[in-house]
Amino acid sequence: MKIGYLGPVGSYSYEAAQKYKKEEDELKESKTIEKVISSLENDAIDICIVPLENAIHGAVVDTMDTILENKDINIIDEIVLDVHHMLMSKTKDSTIAKIYSHSQALEQCKTYLNENFADVEKIPVSSTSYAASLAQKESDTACICNEICKDLYGLEIVSDNIQDIKDNKTRFILLSKSKNSRETKKTSIVFSTKDEPGALYKILGMFSIAEINLTKIESRPAKTKLGDYIFFVDLEGDEKNEKIKLTLANIANYCDEFRILGSY
């Protein structure tokens, strides 16, 4: 099986993919989240692993927006990864004039960076491992990445565990063009409400009446007009469960757009 991930080698997505893959599986990297999911759409890979949310900085909007644009993909599993950020450079004693990392990592380490490198340029790039590759090549440069990158890119640790909270975690989802056949514990849906008073309230009330527990609700701009939103919801239970199936069917009647992203 071919598994796609956000590369290059050494990224947190790579780390998550390593935890999931079996010995016979092949990992295939892409430079952006959009390209990872596009590879799945084009059948270049069988599944892909992408970050969805972080304990400090919240949703990974690139993933959410790309899922909205690709209607034929399903969430089939999730991996929660402990994330311990480290500041690295070619040598410990080098002067640091700029720091590369993924935008999420820069935000997750904001307190440390403000206290120690307030005047240093912070440059967001496509992944933490790509940041490590840049720090390997450039002088007066550091990166924020994971411990895997130390040996992969020949870097030295300047400071470790620099994230704002020590119990930092990122949730990754596995995407496939096939649905899950096994029994599952969680279902993700996405919907937009009709333009009428109390539409969202009515939908949330249906979950309450059916005693279905919601574990997450997140909104994204619908990109139609100001004030229009798409809602991502995680709920406990399998979409094949009769109570959940009936509730979701009723909710769909109150939506302009409704889609089950998958059970896992």
Regions from the language model: what does each represent?
Residues 1-264:
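Domain-level signature for soluble enzymes in the chorismate/prephenate branch of the shikimate pathway
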